[in-house]
Amino acid sequence: MGKLQDGIAIKRINDAITTFKNYKLGELEQGGSMAINTLSNVRAHVGLAWPAILRNCLIHTSSHLGFMKFMIDIATTWKVGAFTLLGSVGDEDPFTDVDLIYTKTCLHLGLKDNDFLQFPEEFAYEANSFLEAQSMNARVDMLTGVHNIEDKYVFRIESISKFLKAYYTASEDVAYLTGFIKPDGSKESILSAELLKAQVTSEVLRVRNLITTKIQQYINLYEDSQLPHFRRAALSYTQDWDVDGGVPAALPQPDTTDDESPVTKPGASAPTVSKGADQPEDEEIIHKKVDASKDAPPKAVSSGNVSARGIPAFLEDDMSEMDAPDGFHDYLTREHENNFDLAQLGLAPSV
């Protein structure tokens, strides 16, 4: 593959960031989605740098919301091969320094190159470990690995569920996540900081709400499915998440939009959420607060935890792989009537 020149490398990461900035929930379900096609193209050309690019997109404020929507889509899709989008292509890393190129790309896009969410150290390691593991374990060889794709689908769903649950726990303290925001004391800097905090808070609350909503919807749809891999995945979610009672949220959640409304089980009521002190504020309120306290020094940020950026990743997967009876081709035959095809699975040979 060889090393990429900076211009080409920046173009690849530019495409990933821009796609996640504009990513909409449900892109994965659309046939011929431009967003999915773009991410697939980037993945095919960045080799082993793919998990590092995804890691940076996870923690940068500009792409965080879109990346998490992408992960939620993969976690709740009926397309059994969609998890391969997390796998890397090839066995080479064409980047000399992914983080440096990512920084250059941010500057090229007019984004701040230090706006990275400050996650607790435990989640930082877990996120790195997860993405590195999926880079290897989410690969599927069309010649030898397709026959047990249904079992791989269940294993990957279980791994993603653990990642989402770790994120859910780590994101309870949004004030800590925004600890990287440190205004210099000027009115403009304080205003910019407050607006960014409001944006991040709103997005994190939305992601938390989407995670529980879409997982609940998946369980409702597939817990009694005739297809065993869907039943197993739904059972795994049921065991990992207290869906019936509503996964306890430490923060208030924003109203959902029409395409993101909660789906509850018959007879079960959705958890009631009231507005509290952590509810995102509108811009007018922020302006008033800044005017009233522009001379106040910025709050101190506690140390001890670090961002996920730059932390060495573990190369272990939390789920083992195993073979299963050959049922994939029969499954494709059954689903062909529903316009189910390999192209829509996201399957691609490892090269």
UniProtKB/Swiss-Prot annotation:
Keywords linked to the UniProt accession: Capsid protein, Host cytoplasm, Outer capsid protein, Virion
Residue numbers spanned by region Disordered: 245-281, 288-307
Keyword NADP attributed: no
Record carries keyword Amino-acid biosynthesis: no
Subcellular location: Virion; Host cytoplasm
Predominant location: virion
Segments crossing the lipid bilayer: none
Compositionally biased residues, Basic and acidic residues: 288-297
InterPro entries: Phyto_Pns9_10 (IPR008776)
Pfam families named among the record's database cross-references: Phyto_Pns9_10 (PF05878)
GO cellular component: host cell cytoplasm; viral outer capsid
Superkingdom of this protein's organism: Viruses
Entry similarity comment: Belongs to the phytoreovirus minor outer capsid protein P9 family.
Function: Minor outer capsid protein.
UniProt name for this protein: Minor outer capsid protein P9
Provenance organism: Rice dwarf virus
Organism lineage: Viruses, Riboviria, Orthornavirae, Duplornaviricota, Resentoviricetes
